[in-house]
Amino acid sequence: MRCTSPAALVTFCAGLWISNHVLAQGLEAGVRSRADCEVCKEFLNRFYNSLLTRGIDFSVDTIEEELISFCADTKGKENRLCYYLGATKDSATKILGEVTRPMSVHMPTVKICEKLKKMDSQICELKYEKKLDLESVDLWKMRVAELKQILHSWGEECRACAEKHDYVNLIKELAPKYVETRPQTEL
């Protein structure tokens, strides 16, 4: 590409800078594709924001202690992420320093997850399970095994359930407790 004037070159460079800046803001604001490292990015963003709101000191030791306690309440894929990071008691490896050091200097969580991916690709292979919309799905058309899976994902169990309608009724009864009702934000 050949620029004929300095003004054209400045305009071109400014356009590149703005497009990269907007893309970076979009990645941080949640307008990103959820394909790569979704559990890592979501979890570390939530953890980082909880540290900010509580006014926690951003020292490496403090962040490590907070991460271990934050991981104590996790379930599912997030618990698996904590296991890979070494923040659970049964973890085989401990790579917490790869999270705490960059976070202590306020490195974006996207960059932290990219570094973790280079160390252990399993971290970025974690994906959240699809959320079940109980208002749109017909529970009566689901298999009993699928209904049991819904209860299991909620941490519930039905020992007295003998037939399908027992499971369906229990899910409908417990749904208000477990189904998130977030207001839809317009983009």
Swiss-Prot record:
Localization in the cell: Secreted
Gene Ontology BP, a term: dopaminergic neuron differentiation
GO cellular component: endoplasmic reticulum; extracellular space
Top-level taxon of the source organism: Eukaryota
Name recorded for this polypeptide: Cerebral dopamine neurotrophic factor
Annotated signal peptide: 1-24
Family label: Belongs to the ARMET family.
Gene Ontology terms for molecular function: growth factor activity
